[in-house]
Amino acid sequence: RTDDIVDSPLAAMLGPERMEEDLRLWKERLDRIWVQEPTDALDMALSDAKKNYPSMDIEPYNDMIDGMLMDTPGHQLFQDRYETWDELYTYCYRVAGTVGLMVLPVLGTSTTHTLEEAIPPGLSLGIAFQITNILRDVGEDALRGRIYLPREDMSKFGVTEEQIIKGVLDDNYKNLMKFEIQRARDYYVEAEAGIPMLAPEA
């Protein structure tokens, strides 16, 4: 529901101030959910999950909203360019890595592993998914004024912002894509190690 606030056609019509206000209200709703005061039926489902799985933490949910704010023009967290992989990692963690932290308490772990052990692979899966999304949507994002590919990587392979915006797919761009695809694959490998850590019924 929060993703639609910043990435739906309606969001573009309503503008960044409305996006920011809606996300602020979502943080308030989360606070109420965590003290068992849900606003509607969907909130009630999350509130019930929190009651049944007490190890659920509110922090990943708030972090995800911060990730949405990174896509909200005018907000102090907003970024439409990323200088380094470390900067982009923060974005990937917030919008996707957090999902692993949200679902792990519900999925549970095997008797031979702890939740803490399963967290790194869970995070890696979210990071891998988000890198994949970024690589899939390079052209679409560029049309919306966003370039998520780290500038340090683009510079390393001789790829310019103008080239990204114009959709020039030369050898430099292809080599950049190979580099980023390998990064995603490395995270998928790290994530795969977490599968045996999950509870069998998961």
What are these regions (language model features)?
Residues R1-P196:
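Acidic catalytic motifs of isoprenoid enzymes
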